[in-house]
């Protein structure tokens, strides 16, 4: 299991996601799926866009073109950083 980095605030995660979107960098994150409570891991995905007011980000899998919209509040780990509110 990779080493955990220091925790970061939700707003810092959103800023980093927006920076990753601008430079088309890949990201890894873990979030809870609201309908079932399952933990979903996205590794090596590209940030397609973000909606600050809506509190969501859309991610693109470069391998197969799958897109997934994630609510920011459900993300609990971003790039090995735990997220706090």
Give the ranges of each region predicted by the language model.
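SH3/SH3-like beta-barrel fold
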Residues: 29, 57-62
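A short, Trp-centered hydrophobic/proline-enriched beta-strand micro-motif
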Residues: 22-33
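Acidic, low-complexity, intrinsically disordered interaction modules
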Residues: 38-53
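Short, flexible beta-strand-to-coil junctions
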Residues: 32-36, 62-64
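Short coil-to-beta-strand transition motifs
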Residues: 35-42, 68-71
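Mixed-charge, Lys/Arg-rich low-complexity intrinsically disordered regions
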Residues: 2-22
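Conserved beta-strand residues within beta-sheet cores
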Residues: 26-28, 43, 72
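Structured surface patches comprising rigid loops and adjacent beta-strands/short helices at the edges
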Residues: 47-50, 69-84
């Amino acid at each position: 299991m990779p080493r955990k980095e220091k925790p970061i605030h939700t707003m810092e995660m959103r800023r980093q996601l927006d920076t990753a979107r601008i430079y088309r960098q890949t990201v890894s994150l873990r979030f809870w799926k609201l309908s079932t409570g399952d933990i979903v891991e996205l590794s090596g995905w590209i940030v397609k866009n973000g909606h600050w007011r809506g509190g969501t980000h859309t991610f693109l899998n470069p391998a197969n073109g799958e897109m997934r919209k994630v609510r920011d509040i459900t993300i609990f780990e971003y790039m090995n950083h735990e997220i706090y509110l």
